[in-house]
């Protein structure tokens, strides 16, 4: 069983997205570079007053932000941007109940990407890289966006067709592109702000990931529960209060539960509670028993065709 720690770095990424919007709205980087270049000028204070207008920009308050994907990160960005006075539009046809509950009531849930493209001044992407999302931001999508849009991508680099993006930047269709993924296409372009994959590079994110990983592994070892596995489904029966508990990793094929209950029946063991979850080719079964599990039961379960691993938890 392989675990991951989704959402542990969500706040770190959220803060970087907000910083990206601010940097794209006002030429803060250009201003800092100008001061560094002119640092030896005796009248730098007076020069600064004369030159500051070239670094002027706009405020994000009152602007429209479109968020594609309202998972852990997208939802946090939505709430924070709304608190900063932005008009936030969210698109996510697969939004979870937990994510929906965490969203501010001020967030407008949009049912079409075209609405995001046509209405929003800023668009940020927070979706996984799938066959269906690869290069979802292509020439067709870019053509539908408002002139002067700011596009942010802190999810996956391949979500954006970068050749089409460069054309849109050069034509002025896109004002700025902010991304966390450096490559030869985007690095050095005057309209692109690139960070070196800093999304989760905070002490807090690293600590959160470590704590979450320890909790997941401990719960699996002590109780047999699975949370946030890459290759197996989420499956939990809490803390075992019965006489025994057995967990079984097996192939996701018909007839497995019948075979397991037959083994228990032949051993004269009553099952007080049971759950089974499947994910792709694999499944996971947990059984609480009214008597302790024995090595004979384990051997009988392991002999069932399709069983990968049997563990006695208690």
Give the residues covered by each predicted segment.
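Oxidoreductase and adenylate-handling cofactor-binding alpha/beta cores
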Residues: 14-33, 79-86, 212-225, 261-265, ...
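Short beta->alpha connector loops at strand-helix junctions that form conserved
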Residues: 1-8, 155, 197-199
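Phosphate-coordination loops involved in phosphoryl transfer and adenosine-cofactor binding
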Residues: 61-64, 139, 148, 243
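Rossmann-like adenosine-cofactor binding region
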Residues: 93-185, 201
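N-terminal Rossmann-fold NAD(P) dinucleotide-binding loop
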Residues: 74-75
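Phosphate-binding beta-alpha-beta segment of Rossmann-like dinucleotide-binding domains, i.e.
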Residues: 5-64, 225-228
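Glycine-rich Rossmann-fold phosphate-binding loop(s) that bind the pyrophosphate
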Residues: 63, 70-71
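NAD(P)-dependent dehydrogenase/reductase Rossmann-like domain
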Residues: 177, 187-190, 198-314
């Amino acid at each position: 069983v392989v675990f991951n720690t989704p959402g542990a770095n969500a706040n770190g990424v959220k803060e970087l997205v907000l910083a990206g919007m601010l940097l794209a709205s006002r030429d803060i980087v250009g201003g800092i570079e100008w001061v560094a270049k002119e640092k030896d000028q005796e009248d730098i204070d007076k020069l600064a007053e004369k030159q500051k207008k070239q670094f002027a920009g706009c405020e994000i308050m009152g602007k429209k932000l479109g968020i594609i994907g309202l998972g852990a990160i997208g939802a946090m960005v939505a709430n924070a941007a709304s608190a900063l006075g932005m008009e936030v539009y969210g698109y996510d046809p697969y939004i979870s109940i937990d994510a929906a509950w965490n969203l501010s009531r001020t967030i407008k849930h949009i049912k079409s990407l075209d609405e995001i493209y046509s209405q929003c001044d800023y668009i940020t992407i927070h979706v996984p890289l799938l066959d269906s999302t690869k290069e979802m931001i292509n020439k067709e999508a870019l053509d539908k966006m408002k002139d002067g849009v700011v596009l942010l991508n802190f999810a996956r680099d391949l979500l954006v067709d970068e050749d089409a993006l460069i054309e849109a930047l050069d034509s002025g269709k896109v004002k700025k592109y902010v991304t966390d993924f450096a490559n030869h296409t985007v690095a050095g372009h005057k309209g692109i702000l690139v960070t070196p994959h800093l999304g989760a590079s905070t002490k807090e994110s690293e600590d959160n990931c470590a704590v979450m990983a320890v909790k997941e592994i401990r719960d699996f070892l002590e109780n047999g529960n699975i949370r946030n596995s890459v290759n197996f489904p989420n499956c939990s029966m809490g803390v075992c209060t019965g006489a025994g508990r057995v967990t079984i990793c097996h192939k996701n094929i018909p007839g497995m539960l019948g075979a397991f209950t037959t083994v228990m029946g032949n051993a004269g063991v009553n099952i007080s509670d049971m759950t089974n979850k499947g994910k792709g080719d694999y499944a996971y079964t947990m059984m609480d028993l009214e008597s302790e599990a024995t090595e004979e039961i384990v051997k009988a379960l392991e002999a069932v065709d399709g069983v990968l691993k049997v563990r006695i938890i208690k």
